């Protein structure tokens, strides 16, 4: 059957329309998205006086995190176990007055990135040049996070990598590079997800706390047993050790955990240190997964765990992170702890521990005002 010119033209237009439809849809969708972005920016500007814009690609920060690939025996729970390790820390490592960015990777053979601030709104990855890129080698574990502290008081921030594996300490060579000094007294293996620098004894030198998650005898790439998970969802106490290292002042550290009263094996995910009682001695707070948080009070001689007596350590939660701040303008720190939540399963909510009225110093007590404060 012959088609006339009009039919052929209509058929051609139909096929052209089919070809153009996805493009038109994308353009319309893009315009709608742009309109929504502009609306959100305007509303944010009206409500808060500023708005945030995603500029990582323009700024040269193109990092893609690679998660850990662990022993195949964990295949059934791999998404849960391998969900950790993406971290970012901000530091002016070269003391040029501009903040730089360090991000960690968590796959064997993957590289971390150190983005140096170029002073023009862009960043350049100098991790290879500085010696802190190739840190996730077979047999050494993978990065879970990074914290910075000037442990030798030379004015430059040094780098501690916490890992599921061997913790790595890098000395900052005055902003020109980093030297690995891991043999400074740190253990060969800690499955850690948190650490904090703080001068617990007031000698002017930064000491170090590292919180274990999985037990230190567990190698997640070569398991001798799959019985590695918490023994309770509320009061688990079969996790990794908590380590306190005293800075000896000669570039080395001594492990003093038990001597200083820190022996817990709860599953540490976050830690922070501050003088919560106003005694001049920094205390230590640990947010634990699968259980209660811990508050270690520093009396100047050793630590004692005071979570229950201060009102904090009685409610089991899945602590994810912790931060201090005087949000009530009391002249005393409140403690904010984030918790994991899953609708219908884990509706825990975050905690805001505020000092109770009439309590202070060594008699301080806390109450949870998270719900009241919204």
Language model feature labels by segment:
Residues 1-374:
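Acidic, glycine/proline-rich Ca2+-coordinating loop motifs
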